[in-house]
């Protein structure tokens, strides 16, 4: 699949800062639900459909202090 966006937010319903394991579980669930393959290359990197992404875990802008998980395509 060709990625149209350089980054995307992964659904995360937790109220606490997402740990590495929570982030990886959320990304795995997102990929499975949307028909993508994923392979984790470390705590902060994931390969989705053969495209390398950086994993951001932190505040989601505009969410009134909620935490989020963002995958950003790496060059």
Residue locations for each model-derived region?
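Terminal, regulation- and interaction-focused segments at domain boundaries
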Residues: 1-25, 29, 33
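Compositionally biased, intrinsically disordered low-complexity regions enriched
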Residues: 12-13, 42, 69-73
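Sterically constrained small-residue positions within well-ordered secondary structures
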Residues: 29, 39, 60-62
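Short, well-structured beta-strand/strand-turn elements
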Residues: 36-42
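Short linear loop/turn motifs
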Residues: 43-49
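Long, continuous compositionally biased terminal/linker segments
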Residues: 49-75
């Amino acid at each position: 699949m060709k990625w149209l966006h350089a980054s995307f937010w992964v659904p995360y319903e937790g109220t606490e800062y997402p740990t590495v394991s929570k982030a990886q579980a959320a990304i795995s669930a997102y990929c499975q639900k949307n028909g993508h393959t994923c392979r984790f290359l470390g705590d902060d990197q994931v390969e989705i459909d053969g495209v390398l992404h950086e994993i951001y875990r932190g505040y989601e802008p505009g969410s009134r202090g909620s935490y989020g998980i963002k995958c950003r395509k790496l060059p």
